[in-house]
Swiss-Prot record:
Biological classification of the source: Eukaryota, Metazoa, Chordata, Craniata, Vertebrata
Keywords per UniProt: ANK repeat, Cell cycle, Cell division, Cytoplasm, Cytoskeleton, Mitosis, Phosphoprotein, Repeat
Protein name: Ankyrin repeat domain-containing protein 53
Gene that produces this protein: ANKRD53
Organism whose genome encodes this protein: Macaca fascicularis
Subcellular location: Cytoplasm, Cytoskeleton, Spindle; Cytoplasm, Cytoskeleton, Spindle pole
Function: Required for normal progression through mitosis. Involved in chromosome alignment and cytokinesis via regulation of microtubules polymerization.
């Protein structure tokens, strides 16, 4: 017992000495029992601290609750728009008026309503809560894209009419370049295709792969849509071509005015240069009687003495016309007279002459104007040729660049093919149907193009004989094989 007590006292004194030693700066090794207790205290303290840190604070609790309520409310709003419950949708929208909630795909309430064809929800969202009709998803889809679906065959048309009335983008493209017309054609919805085309959809729009709506008709074998689109594309092309031709007519009148002004300035400059050259020549001569004024008056008198017929013939007969001749050839820009509307008079048809006597009125008139051209040269083109004033260059898009001789570029140029622009601006280079007398020459049948040329190794006689026969007997087949150089077929052996 004494040893045990002394041992305990030594342990206690050792512990006390160790604490005092720590106070003095000495650091003896601690006992194992003290280290275990100290470790347990530290671990308990750390556990309690972690629990305190994990326990939410009151402010964070309120924020998390608000976020959860907002997410649930937005989910209810999207679900109400999808099922078409208008009252539930109004209740959810009245609770969140700050921003438009979306899901992970970027869909909002108007997208879900359009995807399910809920017209009442669309009207509430657009008219009462001012949702934009061209709101985009993450894939750049608009409500007009989503309403065109094969499941909405019966409800798609009213929704399309409503969205178009509210200003929906008719040719909006998704991230793949698809327009609403592409989707309607792919689904084979002919009524939707008609509504979109009649509203002004671009029938030549291309997606990211370069496909047009008519190409989707061919891929999915929608013949009715293809037939309608083909007719719409033809009408669109003709309308655009007529519009561009009207622009071309206006451009030609502007070019004629530009050429006229250019030739006037060119004539003035050359007149000044000629007078300066004549004055220099006269100063170099030793004839004082020659004066510039008399020569100028004489030249003007000579020019004025020419008749208009002689001036017109000079324009057409000269191979290199002068500036004056070119000015006479340019049609003068004149203002169109205002149309005068007169009251139409009703004329009764004349009575038929029932008499056989041609001398009695009304006398029969059988003469008519000469309609056959007797000349051998083609008639001159009534259109003005701009080849001496304008240069036409093709561009890489199939159109043309117009450049004048005085260094100006003409813009804008009508969107017409290069061949059409060249034919309209250079009518003199237009090929004629037949040039007389070069157009009259004999044509041999050997020069007529054929599908294939029959050579010596072609047995066309055998083919003709086979087409003319009704049955192929053994004798005929043997003759054909011998003609072609083939061995005869062995005769069939009859089994006894």
């Amino acid at each position: 017992m004494a040893s045990a007590g002394s041992t305990a006292r030594r342990a206690g004194s050792g512990s006390w000495h160790s604490e005092r030693g720590e106070g003095r700066g000495a650091r003896p090794q601690p006992t194992p029992h003290g280290s275990m207790q100290r470790a347990n205290k530290v671990s308990l303290k750390a556990t309690w601290t972690d629990a305190e840190s994990k326990q939410p604070r009151p402010s964070e609790e309120s924020d998390q609750t608000t976020i959860d309520q907002t997410a649930i409310r937005s989910y209810y709003q999207l679900f109400a728009a999808a099922v078409g419950n208008v009252e539930w949708l109004r209740f959810c929208l009245n609770q969140s008026l700050r921003e438009i909630p979306t899901d992970y795909k970027g869909f909002t309430a108007i997208h879900f309503a359009a995807q399910r064809g809920k017209l009442a929800c669309l009207q509430v969202l657009v008219e009462e809560y001012k949702f934009p009709v061209n709101l985009l998803t993450n894939n750049s889809q608009t409500p007009l894209h989503l309403v065109i679906h094969k499941d909405n065959t019966t409800v798609a048309l009213p929704c399309i009419y409503y969205l178009l009335e509210k200003g929906a983008a008719l040719n909006a493209q998704t991230c793949n370049g698809c327009t609403p017309l592409h989707l309607a054609v792919r689904e084979g919805l002919l009524d939707c295709v008609k509504v979109l085309v009649q509203s002004g959809a671009n029938v030549h729009a291309q997606d990211a792969m370069g496909y047009k709506p008519i190409d989707f008709c061919k891929i999915w074998n929608h013949r009715a849509c293809a037939r309608f689109l083909k007719d719409a594309m033809w009408k669109k092309d003709k309308k655009d071509f007529a519009c561009e031709m009207r622009k071309m007519k206006t451009l030609k009148s502007q070019l004629a005015l530009m050429e006229y002004n250019y030739l006037i300035e060119y004539q003035k400059e050359h007149k000044i240069l000629r007078e300066a050259a004549i004055r220099k020549w006269l100063h170099g001569k030793l004839h004082p009687g020659h004066s510039l004024v008399s020569n100028t008056k004489q030249a003007r008198a000579t020019a004025l003495s020419k008749t208009p017929e002689q001036r017109g013939s000079q324009c057409s007969s000269s191979f290199h016309p002068s500036v004056e001749a070119r000015l006479q050839c340019i049609p003068q820009p004149t203002e169109m007279p205002k149309p005068i509307y007169r009251k139409s008079t009703i004329k009764r048809p004349t009575m038929w002459n029932v008499s056989n006597n041609p001398a009695r009125p009304p006398t029969t008139k059988i003469s008519h104007s000469q309609g056959i051209r007797l000349g051998v040269h083609p008639d001159p083109s009534p259109e003005h040729d701009f080849s001496s004033f304008l240069e036409v260059r093709p561009d890489r898009h199939g159109g043309a660049w117009l450049h004048t001789v005085d260094g100006h570029w003409v813009a804008p140029v009508p969107r017409l093919p290069f061949e059409v622009l060249l034919r309209m601006l250079y009518p003199h280079v237009r090929p004629y149907r037949m040039k007389v007398p070069q157009g009259f020459y004999p044509i041999s049948m050997r020069e007529v193009p054929r599908k294939r040329h029959l050579g010596d190794d072609t047995f066309w006689t055998d083919t003709l004989a086979m087409n003319l026969r009704d049955t192929f007997d053994e004798a005929f087949l043997a003759a054909v094989r011998s003609h072609q150089g083939l061995p005869a077929l062995p005769s069939p052996q009859i089994n006894p």
